[in-house]
Amino acid sequence: MILLPCYIFGAQSVLIDSLTIFIFEQVNMKKEYPVKHLGAAQIPSSLPISSSSRYEDFKFVNDDNCILHDVAVSSINEEQAPHSFEQAGPRALSYFDSSKVRAGIVTCGGLCPGINNVIRTIVMQLHHNYGVQRIHGFRYGFQGFIPSYQHDIMDMTPENVRNIHNLGGSILSSSRGPQDPVEIVDCLERNNIRILFCIGGDGTLRGAHGIAEEVDRRNENMSIIGIPKTIDNDIPYCVKTFGFETAFSKAVEAVQAAHSEAYGYNYGVVIIKLMGRNSGFIAANTSLACPDVNFVLIPEVPFTMEGEKGLLHSLESGFEAKKEQGRHPHSVIVVAEGAGQNLLGNNSNERDASGNIRFKDIGAFLKENIQQYFKDRYPVNIKLIEPSYMIRSLPANPHDAIFCYYLADHAVHAAMAGKTDMMVGYWNGHFTHVPLEVVIKDQKRINPHGEFWRQVLFSSGQPGDMYSPK
């Protein structure tokens, strides 16, 4: 594979699977960012796995095992080893004594299908496979560590998590916003917790890295493991995040209903606003799965409303083309919440609890401008649908449930082996260990010059360029 030049963040575009090309900096994880380890693991693993098994899937994983960054390259430099990740999986030796160690779990940020699946698997794996008896859940995100909030700490047992995978949301609840790593580590020390699993998105992973740094400053032996969670699917070095498939599958149902609504009127227009602050994966995947969509607007691809190439003229041209073909003039527009913010004059420094810039409502903006433009042209009937919060509060679908199990399973193996300051990633069909230091440097975004976006354009039929400079 030839690495294409990148047009966002000055990085490189990297092939991850057969369809999607993401954009972020390419680095050699194993060489430049080795996974941190608390020390030598010396306790034989209690897992029923043999180092000498002739079946590869039933062997312990060695720290030297690598997952290649690229499955295809244009050439190989003999003097430079291929870029790779450390492979996830059970190790033959454990760092922590399972009869003594205590573990904690926290969920932060927005809800996402599959959180409870991850919690359940962590508890079950720690208890049944490693024999860890004391597992605690911290409620309401990082607030749960701070005494002033007075949140109770939950005892997590196999019995009280047995059926939680059938529920949406998080049994630990959540909150947004950072907390002082010093206070968090103080809480961990007070409760003698040596392993902490942080389930969350980019803000949570930044927080987890801050906790790991504070632990390191104190020279404490604590394992801090991140598990990526976001329906925006924008965590780098992870092909997909859990819950994403469930979320966009539900969004497809909304688009199908929207198409029926648009088709029910002459010049019917329905706008579906979906989540996606800086990355348009939900909008793009939903549109590709539902080819009734005519326009897909994402943060990675700028567009204008006015001008010959603008959205309004393109929408009008679509109406005229359908009339000429004897077809019913209507249109379905899918837009990510972070798209077109430059058109709304969003130069505000106002931020939410997570530190994200507060976006203005692109859905309402599109509706108002389309109504105004067609007022004296066509009798458009326009509606705005926002299924955002409905699609993220569902239980995980079967495929996501399996993915959650694998993520949590590998997180437990990493923690018991003494790994720390790392995230469990998923790359080229394998689970990996990715240092948080590099994860928090970037976001995964759609490459507007890549195969995936080209397929979205072909499916929707929208122009490849809807930007008219003034």
Task: Report the location of each language-model feature.
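Accessory alpha-helical/coil subdomains and C-terminal extensions
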Residues: 187, 198-200, 206-221, 241-380
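Glycine-rich oxoanion-binding loops at beta->alpha junctions
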Residues: 63-96, 144-194, 231, 242-249, ...
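N-terminal phosphate-binding or glycine-rich loops at protein starts, especially the Walker A/P-loop
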Residues: 29-45, 96-146
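Short glycine/serine/threonine-rich phosphate/pyrophosphate-binding segments
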Residues: 112-122, 145-146, 180-184, 202-210, ...
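Short glycine-rich or small-residue beta-strand-to-loop segments that form or flank ligand, phosphate
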Residues: 102-112, 170-173, 194-200, 226, ...
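Glycine/threonine-rich beta-strand-loop-alpha-helix active-site module
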Residues: 124-151, 209, 215-258
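C-terminal non-catalytic interaction/assembly regions of soluble proteins
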Residues: 27-55, 348-470
